[in-house]
Design a protein with these regions (language model features):
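Amphipathic, Lys/Arg-enriched alpha-helical "gate/interface" segment within cytosolic domains
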Residues: 1-117
Length: 117
């Protein structure tokens, strides 16, 4: 189970507070697919709590999902203190049409404000 919230019809937030597995990734992708049906383009806020592990194969699978749905993302705000995840997200900024910003947990309010604009 993931924690989720919405700022508006086109803005969805996800908080990940436990290690990511295939089931959780599938749940996130299902949520995003349902949001795509409601709004042609969405802003996505993802907060990854400290200590959460995300296996590399699942990061790649998620990148493939986002690339397949590239035109459906307007902004991605990623909040994490994990350097490895931050670097992967910086790479996404180069390959996706969406604006991708990475924030530290201390700047999570700034991330929420940015994604809601």
């Amino acid at each position: 189970m993931i924690s989720r919230f919405e700022f508006a019809d086109n803005v969805v937030g996800i908080i990940i507070d436990r290690d990511v597995d295939k089931k959780m990734l599938h749940e996130v992708h299902d949520l995003l697919r349902s949001k795509f049906k409601q709004s042609a383009v969405i802003n996505l806020y993802v907060e990854i709590k400290p200590g959460v592990k995300i296996p590399v194969p699942l990061l790649v699978k998620d990148l493939i999902f986002q690339l397949r749905n590239n035109g459906k993302f307007n902004k991605l705000a990623i909040v994490t203190n994990q350097d490895f995840v931050r670097n992967i997200m910086k790479f996404r900024d180069f390959v996706m049409d969406a604006d991708v910003e990475i924030f530290t947990p201390e700047n999570r309010i700034r991330a929420m404000n940015w994604i809601a604009e």
